[in-house]
Amino acid sequence: DPYGLGDSDLHFRVLDIPNFGNAVTSYYYNTIGGYSAVKMQRYQDLIDRYISSEIRQVFKATENAATVQEVAAALPELKVVSMLNGRYIILDGNISPVLNPNAYGNCWFVDSYIPAATPDEEIALLAHTDLRNTAVIGDDFAWAQDAIRHFENSSDCHFELVEKSPTIALTHYAPNELRYSFSTDTERAAIFSEIYYPKGWKAWIEPEGAYGEVRNGHYHPSGEGRPIELFRADWMLRGAMIPSGEGQLIMRFEPDSYQLGENISRASSIALILLLLGSAAGMILTGRREGKNA
């Protein structure tokens, strides 16, 4: 921890402006930026269209600031950096990182959505949408739009029955597994500051206090757990419909290719064992026959 952030949160990101294009800071923190030879095109589009612009806004707003406190006071609202949970901003390696008070956190509930008919419209809508309360969802996830629309219609009629604010929070973080606890009186849409990647990430809802088993690297829900679908929101983030009640959401990276490899490996092992057993049985029978003929 070269900057001594001392942050007890399970997961947040750092925007290191001087080292934005390399992996120096990524060794210590989760970062916005960094170098990757396999960077997703949608992420690169987000950098080109929004994050680069927000970095320029930071420089312009803080160019006359002489102290960390003045930098913090002058910091503009950074919508895309905030939705990516960019909690700290490094302007200069010689001064302390600046806290971004507007960071959305690891996850949040939204009350509504705006549909996007095309990818161009989807990324453009980020500039004009209150992303803290409204999600931008492409028409390729019409089922998620329908689910949120149903919630909107229900809340309009029964808002007075909602007695407490819904909550959702990250409780466990690992590169291949995330767990969130939630409490809500009605079904709601949650957005997560994680990259949507359909080829491997799977999700389950578990009742409060329940957790399935991880066997051979794969998550097996408890008897009461049920799988749910994830959707893409705000150009590249994950979204999920959270049912009413209390419980936990588990996301785990389990690509089908891994499962296929496991099955092939298991089948090969069984075949090898059967072959060895068959060979051993053959040797025993041959030995008995030779003994009788002796």
Question: For the regions a protein language model found, what residue spans apply to each?
Answer:
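Extracytoplasmic/lumenal acceptor-recognition loop(s) of multi-pass membrane glycoenzymes
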Residues: 1-81, 99-153, 198, 208-211, ...
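Short, hydrophobic beta-strand segments that form beta-sheet elements in well-ordered domains
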Residues: 13-16, 86-91
